Amino acid sequence: GARQDSLIDIGQQVGFSLEPAADSLKMADSYYQNCGQLEAIHQKLVEQLRANGLLDIYQRIELPLTKVLAAMELNGIKVDQAWLAGLAGEWQTKLAELTQKIYQQAGQDFNINSPKQLQVVLFDDLKLVSKGLSKTKSGPSTDAANLQKLQQQHPIIELIIEYRELSKLLNTYALSLPKLINRDDGRLHANFQQAITATGRLSASEPNLQNIPTKTEIGKKLRQAFITDPGCQLISFDYSQIELRIMASLANEQGMIADFVAGQDIHLATAAKINDIPLDQVSDQQRRAAKAVNFGLLYGQGPHGLAEATGLSYGAAKDFIDQYFVVYPRIAEYMNEAVDQARRLGFAATVWGRRRYLPDLDSPNQAIRRAAERMAINLPIQGTAADIMKAAMIAVDDWLADNFDQRQARLILQIHDEILIEAASEKVDKIIAAVPKLMTDVIDLAVSLAVSTKTGFNWAEL
């Protein structure tokens, strides 16, 4: 799904022979010769974009976005280094306590980080039942999905899950982030990549802040470390259920469109329709199942996945999905049409024409072919969401530049369906009044987009 090419690779793809420097003495001459061909390579690439109907998205989205991302990288995000250091110490102590509790439950000391040793402890020593678990060459896997299934069998499982989450946050963030903080401004300056993922979504590195948990208490504690300059606030603008709105629009599913237009809780409305009951009689379990189906279908989830996500039996999960397609028949038709079109064209495309080529749609291997079919269904939805987000970032950045100087308001992060702005407190109201409309106006869909807004003095408050 991801690829990075060097100038030499790109030149060779369009018929130019560029040579790497053989040694340091020839490096300057090699760079000079290669750079001399940049304009010709550029023209060839533009011709390819035009021939494939991609020139518009390049000129309207990807090219202007480079300026936005460069500014975001320079802006960075402020870090409370004292809080982070305190958190690291607290978590190291907590991790040591968890380690001892796990040893007590196991009746022995062992390397908790070793899947093989953990496998022996759980299934050989503690005799946990492995039926229904995914397997590795050496036996039942101890991955996160299997641990969730084992939770009811032994109290050690919950401790291991907590240990793993805490260990990851400690090592990936609390202990590693201080090494990446710029000493001059006390800020983290991540790298943003706009052309790495196959769907067009942005990715980030050094650090990647997209994987910090949002709902767990320890994840929220870590987010408290991300703060603002004095006199400023963070403002979050988050697209609400953007992929479901795109799916309803692409499928022209009138039932779902009507629920969105009416401002209904879409998961509640889905559960009510599937179970044929009034909205006020929907249980939490029924809403959870509806939510799992609504989002799961975007990624090709079937009855087995729904059963795992909700605790339903396989039969009940299958019935739920079958009834879902009765309630929303155009969703099923859209999924079939998306696969058929991608197979006919050789690629899936977003609303604005971004392509993902899918040669595996014709694979004789069923598993590989099914994976490509899921991509054909998902790319027009997730890829369109990515295009919309990029267009919104450009629109918001332009508006901020027209109305404020860099010290008063600036884009600092884009994560999933959300952008973060750091702004002087006295400018917050003006920004909140303008930005949601900028974000919703970038595209005209059958279902209007919606943006939620939150403010705070650190990331955990959003």
Model regions and ranges:
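A short acidic-Thr-Gly-centered motif at the start of a beta-strand
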Residues: 218-233, 401-405
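C-terminal polymerase-core module
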Residues: 93-100, 104-157, 326-374, 378, ...
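Conserved "right-hand" nucleotidyltransferase catalytic core of DNA-directed polymerases
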Residues: 2, 6-18, 23-214, 233, ...
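Conserved catalytic core of nucleic-acid polymerases
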Residues: 74, 182, 189-190, 195-197, ...
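Metal-dependent catalytic core segments for phosphate chemistry
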Residues: 236, 243-275, 355-369
